[in-house]
Amino acid sequence: MSERRVVVDLPTSASSSMPLQRRRASFRGPRSSSSLESPPASRTNAMSGLVRAPGVYVGTAPSGCIGGLGARVTRRALGISSVFLQGLRSSGLATVPAPGLERDHGAVEDLGGCLVEYMAKVHALEQVSQELETQLRMHLESKATRSGNWGALRASWASSCQQVGEAVLENARLMLQTETIQAGADDFKERYENEQPFRKAAEEEINSLYKVIDEANLTKMDLESQIESLKEELGSLSRNYEEDVKLLHKQLAGCELEQMDAPIGTGLDDILETIRIQWERDVEKNRVEAGALLQAKQQAEVAHMSQTQEEKLAAALRVELHNTSCQVQSLQAETESLRALKRGLENTLHDAKHWHDMELQNLGAVVGRLEAELREIRAEAEQQQQERAHLLARKCQLQKDVASYHALLDREESG
């Protein structure tokens, strides 16, 4: 195969011409016109002031094959010296306008012209590289046709690349499923942790209601004891009042009539003496009766006053007893309402416990299922890892075979 020489004029002061050496090309398909019309990534990186590695790749690598070599033109083959690359780096850095150099339009225009010229030369070199790649591919295909085993090897490479791509996609799908399952488990855990404060608040409220019920029971017992003591005091006051009334009646009815037992004389003196004695007795009797009546009246007034005070006290006790009974009834109603509230809260707590138990059972079942799926996924991932290692081993073996084949081709070409 004949060699073609391309002379590249460098944008520096010293121009040089270097031969475009023959490079090894991979067995790629023909490059589309879009790769020729649009500037490649290497050109974009060169325009932005970034220096590529010593091997400058021209065109795009095929997406179907992972281990493709690609048509490559070295910096020496392109005829671009390191001095030009350093100048291009400094020029690319100078294109960033500083605040004090915004008016330097001439330098920017010169740099733009230099870049346009460089892009045109790179485009020409790409066309030359494409032609060389086509000729090299045709030459290698003709040799592979003569050897007779290149088609099977190429089919094996294509199937290996396809298997590796499918394995990568399947691994990504399994990773996505694992992340989705983990996110679902985290969501269930977060919901369970969010429900815990509500449950604790309900339990604290129920405990506070228990305390209120205990205090109400203690108050009820205290009021019942006070009512019993008031009833006993009222009974003792009633008995004392009856005893005082009976004693007063006895004092009023206790005056006994005196019997006259002296004989009546027949003489005037005896009659007068008898009348005088009788009169004295009547006077003394009247005086005693008047004193007794006065004393009885005083005692009656005192008893009436005491009775009035006792009646007032009894009325006050009746009012207090009525108020106490009203309070007891209200406390009983309150106790009944608290008991109803307690029963409702107990039912609610029972339902909440039942619901939480069901949720925990469901979560346990879900976690068990997820763990089983995770174990299956891990087993599949390990199997895929083994398959991937096997494919990588096959890929390395194929690369070694390709390298040996290229060495044979080089020896044939040199021979």
From Swiss-Prot:
What Pfam families is this protein classified in? Filament
The molecular function terms in GO held by this entry are:
structural constituent of cytoskeleton; structural constituent of eye lens
List the record's Gene Ontology CC terms alphabetically: cell cortex; cytoskeleton; intermediate filament; plasma membrane
Report which residue ranges the record marks as coiled coil. Answer: 115-144, 199-253, 309-400
Q: Which residues carry this modification: Phosphoserine?
A: 26, 32, 35, 90
One GO BP: lens fiber cell development
**Stretches for region Head:** 2-114
Q: Which PROSITE patterns match?
A: IF_ROD_2
For this protein, the record's SMART domains field holds: Filament (SM01391)
Which residues does the annotated region (Tail) include?
Answer: 396-415
Q: In which tissues is it expressed?
A: Lens.
Show the segment(s) annotated as Disordered.
1-46
| Entry superkingdom | Eukaryota
What topology in the membrane does the UniProt record assign?
Answer: Peripheral membrane protein
Annotated IF rod domain residues: 104-415
Q: What InterPro entries does the record point to?
A: IF_rod_dom (IPR039008), Keratin_I (IPR002957)
Q: Which residues carry this modification: N-acetylserine?
A: 2
Q: Which UniProt keywords apply?
A: Acetylation, Cataract, Cell membrane, Coiled coil, Cytoplasm, Cytoskeleton, Disease variant, Eye lens protein, Intermediate filament, Membrane, Phosphoprotein, Repeat, Sensory transduction, Vision
* Annotated family: Belongs to the intermediate filament family.
What does this gene product do?
Required for the correct formation of lens intermediate filaments as part of a complex composed of BFSP1, BFSP2 and CRYAA. Plays a role in maintenance of retinal lens optical clarity.
How does the annotation summarize its subunit structure? Part of a complex required for lens intermediate filament formation composed of BFSP1, BFSP2 and CRYAA. Found in a complex composed of PPL (via C-terminal linker domain), BFSP1 and BFSP2 in the retinal lens. Within the complex interacts with PPL (via C-terminal linker domain) and with BFSP1. Identified in a complex that contains VIM, EZR, AHNAK, BFSP1, BFSP2, ANK2, PLEC, PRX and spectrin. Interacts with LGSN. Interacts with VIM.
User: Can you name this protein?
Assistant: Phakinin
- State the organism named in the record: Homo sapiens
Instruction: Write the gene name.
Output: BFSP2
